[in-house]
Amino acid sequence: MVYIPSLEKPRVKETCTTHQPVVICIDTSGSMNEKAEDGRTKIEIVEQMVNSLSKIDLSESEKGAVDICVLAFDDECRVLQDWIPLSDFKGNLKLDAEGCTALGSAIIDSIDATRARRRAYQAPDYGIDARRAQIFLYTDGISTEDMSKAIEYSQDYLNRDKPSAKLYTILI
């Protein structure tokens, strides 16, 4: 899948001058149904972690300056929540796990989402400053697809786009 941004004017809190774009990318492959040490499934743990962002201890102004997009991937990558200010995130995601692990596609789509958001910030009628994008990738395993395209795409992105994004991998 190729990330296709909404054609609507991006939702941002107008009172914030500098924004922090954050992509949350969640592995929803079948292996995420495995039980963790505490008896919950891995997907339940990630669901709780991501949903808890709605209750994060930040001021409304700080929450308004963080824009999030939530992606999920198994056999393919899909948008669960298109870009919204963190202050508008309800934390009511319900995740199901099945399929393979299209990790390479998830990385490419996460990069594309950050590029799309940066273009929206830089639109003539917006002119919003942005911090370096953050991508948080929650996964438990190894990709079931060839990673060479994702590696090449990532290297090109890091060399061409300034500022690029930081990618954090959270192993479950």
Show where each model-derived region lies:
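Short beta-strand-loop
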Residues: 64-94
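Extended, compositionally biased accessory segments flanking or bridging domains
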Residues: 22-25, 42, 46-52, 80-89
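DG-centered beta-turn motif at the end of beta-strands
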Residues: 26-29, 46, 70, 110, ...
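Surface-exposed acidic, glycine-flexible loop patches that form ligand/cofactor-binding
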Residues: 12-16, 55-62, 113-129, 159-161
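Von Willebrand factor
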Residues: 78, 90-131, 145, 168-172
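…and closely analogous acidic/polar surface helices at protein-protein or active-site interfaces
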Residues: 19, 30-65, 161
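Acidic, polar low-complexity linker/tail segments
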Residues: 1-40, 118, 122-125
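VWA/integrin I-like adhesion module and closely mimicked acidic/polar interface patches used
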Residues: 141-172
